[in-house]
Amino acid sequence: QRYEMNRAAGDLILPNHFATNNLNTAVNYKGNQEGWHDQTQAVFASVETGWKNMLFLTLTGRNDWASQLAYTDNKSYFYWSAGLSAVISNMVEMPSWLTFMKMRGSYSQVASPFDRFLSNPSYKYNDQTHNWSKSDTYPAHDLKPEDTRSWELGLNVRFLESLSLDVTYYRSNTYNQTIYAPLSASSGYKNFVAQTGNIQNQGVELALGYDNKWGDFSWSSNFTYTFNQNKIKELAHGIPDPITGIPVDV
């Protein structure tokens, strides 16, 4: 992924002639140029298998090499997922009113890189003073990708010929979120990058459906209920100062 942009602003030498070569660079001139190029290389594998139309297993794995991780101790990151489902109605004899039952469970881990230039800060251009200055963020080399771990349990049931019920419970926790913590002015920097926190998201989804047909007339309806809760389980606490090693509270 590549992004480039050049921009300039200032007073006009000739009125109503809007061109960059008509800008008065001596008065109120503002010029800026920026751009970046991100690159991610990955290896992905997936396996799906089943047994006697009763048990089904899915496994996936992926390893990413992202350019944002350059100049860090972690050159790549691996994440995976696993899902298992069991068709109970094919395993044991069910009551006549219960035509189908399936239970399912899954776990997944998803990682994503942090913002570019955090491990290798670039110079900043001030379009007011037309000067370049170094970044005021202390360079960090022990950064890790943001990590989200999720698991889900579900039940699918069809009964009384026309009714269906789908119940799902899910929970996810996100770790290694990137924040900026203040540094002492004597360090020569304004802040440093820290990765911490635990944000939890969990909820329940219920879906009740009804499908029937009478001659040429058919009816299909679905009722859903959703409950979702977000909670901050852990904030930044006791992060070591990269220079002094003293814990810092944010």
Report the location of each language-model feature:
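Extracellular/periplasmic, surface-exposed regions of secreted and cell-surface proteins
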Residues: Q1-V250
